[in-house]
Amino acid sequence: MRILVVEDDPEVRSAIKMVLEAEAYEVAESGDGADALAKLRVSPQPSLILLDLMMPGMNGWQFMDEVRVHPGLRQVPIIVVPAYGSADGVLSVGATDYLKKPFAPETLLAVVSRHT
């Protein structure tokens, strides 16, 4: 199962990758929305996307807009992983679920397993 992690903080991205790879998930990484879209055009479709909202360049909101209109990607589950504030509204604009930071590895795995 392939998961795309879109997160601008390299430490958070690395921690998520480590937890997922320990459970035999294949992980692709991206530091912003534009890079993630470019990877989606040339890489195999992920089974799930973990998405930060606040990123430089193309943020998570803009990324979701792009993914949800793409015929080959609109059904891929997106789990939003916001750092600050609430996740209000993310489900109505294309997110499948959300997981607020900070989170325990067990919580991350539970949310991911619900959607894979």
Question: Can you say where each PLM-predicted feature lies in the sequence?
Answer:
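Active-site residues of response regulator receiver
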Residues: D52
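C-terminal output helix
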Residues: F103-R114
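Acidic, metal-coordinating helix/loop segments flanking the phosphotransfer/catalytic sites
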Residues: E29-L48, V90
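Two-component/phosphorelay signaling modules centered on CheY-like receiver
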Residues: P10-A28, H115
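Hydrophobic/aromatic residues positioned on beta-strands within the core alpha/beta folds
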Residues: I79-V81
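Receiver (REC) domain active-site loop signature in two-component systems and cognate sites
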Residues: M55
